[in-house]
Amino acid sequence: MLQPWSEIAPRLVDVAMGRKPADLVVRNGRWVNVYSGEIVPGADIAIVGGRFAYVGPDAGHTIGEGTKIVDAAGRYLVPGLCDGHMHVESGLVTVTEFARAVIPHGTTTMFVDPHEIANVLGIAGVKLMNDEAQTLPVNIFVQVPSCVPSAPGLENAGATLSAADVREALAWPNIIGLGEMMNFPGVAANDSKMVAEIAATRAAGLTVGGHYASPDLGRAFHAYAAGGPADDHEGTTVEDAIARVRQGMRSMLRLGSAWFDVAAQVKAITERGIDPRNFVLCTDDSHSGTLVSDGHMNRVVRHAISQGLKPITAIQMATLNTAQHFGLERDLGSIAPGRRADLIVTSDLTALPIEIVFVRGRLLAEKGVLVADIPAYDYPASAKNTVKLGKRLAPTDFDICAAGSSEVEVRVIGVIENQAPTKALQRRLPVECGVVQMDRASDVCQIALVERHRATGGVINAFVSGFGYDTHCAMASTVAHDSHHMIVVGTNKADMAQAANRLQEVGGGIVLIAGGRELALVELPVAGLMSDQRAEIVAEKASRLVEAMRACGCKLNNAYMQHSLLALVVIPELRISDVGLIDVTRFESTEVIVR
């Protein structure tokens, strides 16, 4: 167990003075000092009890008979990287397997909002993930989900978190604050539940996470800032980034598997000269394939540097800035006395190869390989078998009827590649035998939201464009932010029914059916959201899914992540939920057929 600085301080002082030996000394490195913005050559670091005791020239006086010595050989000594906002569930793996995947990439601290599992299992799911996080050798702080469901009245999730639930959870150990406040209209309207949650968080001295997914930077935005959220990761333009910082919020710039928002917003620093101290890098959503093949926060830092940031600035935005934002500056986010001994050794600050990773003074990864033993975490039976459709679905469950017409104008959800927002489109579609037909030639296929929490048998149908499928196929997923019912997208209703029924059989996941044949399946038995297998195994299955989607004509980058967001009724413009088709710009339901 890591001792607080206040308890271990006498021991740190003794080591720094040379009266007692360090546990570990890293010698001959170039110290990346995120406080001064310097690269300090010829630095040694002495560590004891999982914390930095001495950082400076020649730590020979701290070396004793049992001290382990690592020669950095002139390489850079960088603070462990922090992810300022993320959802573990997006990796399709448990917290343990996510940690195993990202430690070799230099991520040593994560700030996690488990609102995905909360929408399925409620407060019990949040506690499960928080308990699991505390068993791990890295720093995983948990935020209490603020909006479950994300938009009351516009969707029904598998569970509801009340203001009382939130208040109770804020007192748990390891809780760092309130998760992203997605109900931005509620904040602007002084909704009593939102006000109560924010007040409880502030009273506890914790941080309120933000989520302002609107291009409107007028009164509603200013009201949102006045309501209390301390950060926001939903910006996509340079003006978004600047507006948030000007209002005293941290602007979180995200590079996830499907979100590429750093390039545009980092110009606030590189071109507009805005002080970088209030900018934080994060991933938000990273799937297992990205983690295994491309990295995690090291990927984000590299990308930020490629967009014009100085390496030291990009590193500050993934270490010190993040720690300061969450009130943890005196505990982590830098290589300085008293802080947790989270340390990366790298030979290149631009390419950022992660060669050695220490967390709390313990060697966890070397040369891109996890060297520590991290045991698996067993989820209880109550977290599994969560897909309850109430019946086997038939092709006719996906009919959209329009009696008495030969052609109708319909609303269509338009997918935007690499972005979370969608477009509200309209198209004219033919009607045959009273049923509206898809138009595959014009890239208009069907989408269905299948209720899967309470076995109601409910199916909401609509149209979607942007996937580019050019054959009979359907993909179904129980990862369907944020309510996590089941989303089915297809060009063929028989395949849609088969895909939905298959996921009920396996207890959740993602499946692609083409012409009655199963092309790919990713089983996600934990809440229908996560696998308890290794990230490498899940990534391989997900890779086969992507290949199958491409074989069916879909060329979108990270298409299945785009698929998973089509029910996210807090991001404009048009979404689907168990209530119906949702106009997010107006926060109200609307009809598929334009009257």
Swiss-Prot record:
It holds the Pfam family Adenine_deam_C. Gene3D superfamilies: Metal-dependent hydrolases, Urease, subunit C, domain 1. GO terms for biological process: adenine catabolic process. It catalyses: adenine + H2O + H(+) = hypoxanthine + NH4(+). InterPro entries: Adenine_deam, Adenine_deam_C, Amidohydro-rel, Metal-dep_hydrolase_composite, Metal_Hydrolase. The keyword Manganese applies. Its EC number is 3.5.4.2. SUPFAM superfamilies: Composite domain of metallo-dependent hydrolases, Metallo-dependent hydrolases. Its cofactor is Mn(2+). Keywords: Hydrolase, Manganese, Plasmid. GO terms for molecular function: adenine deaminase activity. Belongs to the metallo-dependent hydrolases superfamily. Adenine deaminase family. This is Adenine deaminase 3. It comes from Rhizobium meliloti (strain 1021).
